[in-house]
Amino acid sequence: MSAGGGRAFAWQVFPPMPTCRVYGTVAHQDGHLLVLGGCGRAGLPLDTAETLDMASHTWLALAPLPTARAGAAAVVLGKQVLVVGGVDEVQSPVAAVEAFLMDEGRWERRATLPQAAMGVATVERDGMVYALGGMGPDTAPQAQVRVYEPRRDCWLSLPSMPTPCYGASTFLHGNKIYVLGGRQGKLPVTAFEAFDLEARTWTRHPSLPSRRAFAGCAMAEGSVFSLGGLQQPGPHNFYSRPHFVNTVEMFDLEHGSWTKLPRSLRMRDKRADFVVGSLGGHIVAIGGLGNQPCPLGSVESFSLARRRWEALPAMPTARCSCSSLQAGPRLFVIGGVAQGPSQAVEALCLRDGV
């Protein structure tokens, strides 16, 4: 797109969700945005399921989830949405896997995960669902990799990740699944690893240069970006506290190395717990938490062509801890926390896509 900066983007505001929530699970299927589970005002996981018809801009209530949960993963398989893992009302990870049949408007239980887990990362490839890592009921990070075969309704084990973690960022590129970051307890993970789907082997890549919690990650044009977050103090710096940063680190998949961009190419705002995505040749960073007493509403983009950060139109509703989903020219920002769990549903769009 030839327009620069904010001229290339606009916000599209959708009707608010009937149910306010944070840590909801989201999916997009055939013109419908599904929002499943999450935590409501009481702080407990929900079984509520709702869908937004993108054409009519109307919300419909769906049959409730058989298992109330928050922080689950979701994968679209044709006319089905598979919901995997998460945490239940007693804050315990669950093994439940359930599928919503779009054409029939009902849920079906599927083969459970071999181990209960929250913070599972999922990737779909050729109709198979890969579930990586997670945190079990004992709070230990998991290294397990499982693949779900829908025709047989079963999970099979694959070679474990070299580094156990939960809440990692995953990217499918070629025949490889890239796994970046995540956490082990309260500690952020710097590992960057790739699973070859054909050879079924793991490769360790150089670790992230800096240790940051609640960073944002994206992949675009053969590079992986790690942005912002809470910088963790070094092992010998006992008096330092975590602090918000605007760090930008970039991994070149072809050359196999990280570059920490100079101060002049850092984000404009220091932020953590924000939404990040790739739209029209830009890496975009949306909302989150910073040094201010309330969530950020600022939005910025890094132009891959011009190699600079530019301010974009601010969020209509400033929030952090949002669910997000990219569908075509739209990056949806759903729910999250404003002054409490939010009902807001907004999408940052390329102007040609509004």
Swiss-Prot record:
Main subcellular localisation: cytoplasm
Repeat (Kelch) residue spans along the chain: 1-31, 32-79, 81-127, 128-175, 176-222, 224-281, 282-329, 331-354
Keyword annotations of the record: Cell cycle, Cell division, Chromosomal rearrangement, Cytoplasm, Kelch repeat, Repeat
InterPro entries associated with the record: Kelch-typ_b-propeller, Kelch_1, Kelch_domain_containing_8
Keyword Repeat attached: yes
Localization of this protein: Cytoplasm; Midbody
Highest taxon of the lineage: Eukaryota
GO CC entries: cellularization cleavage furrow; cytoplasm; cytosol; intercellular bridge; midbody
GO biological process, one term: mitotic cytokinetic process
UniProt entry tagged with the keyword Repeat: yes
One Pfam match: Kelch_KLHDC2_KLHL20_DRC7
Disease: Lymphoma, Hodgkin, classic: A malignant disease characterized by progressive enlargement of the lymph nodes, spleen and general lymphoid tissue, and the presence of large, usually multinucleate, cells (Reed-Sternberg cells). Reed-Sternberg cells compose only 1-2% of the total tumor cell mass. The remainder is composed of a variety of reactive, mixed inflammatory cells consisting of lymphocytes, plasma cells, neutrophils, eosinophils and histiocytes. A chromosomal aberration disrupting KLHDC8B has been found in a family with the nodular sclerosis type of Hodgkin lymphoma. Translocation t(2,3)(q11.2;p21.31).
Main function: Involved in pinching off the separated nuclei at the cleavage furrow and in cytokinesis. Required for mitotic integrity and maintenance of chromosomal stability. Protects cells against mitotic errors, centrosomal amplification, micronucleus formation and aneuploidy. Plays a key role of midbody function involving abscission of the daughter cells during cytokinesis and appropriate chromosomal and nuclear segregation into the daughter cells.
Protein name: Kelch domain-containing protein 8B
Organism annotation: Homo sapiens
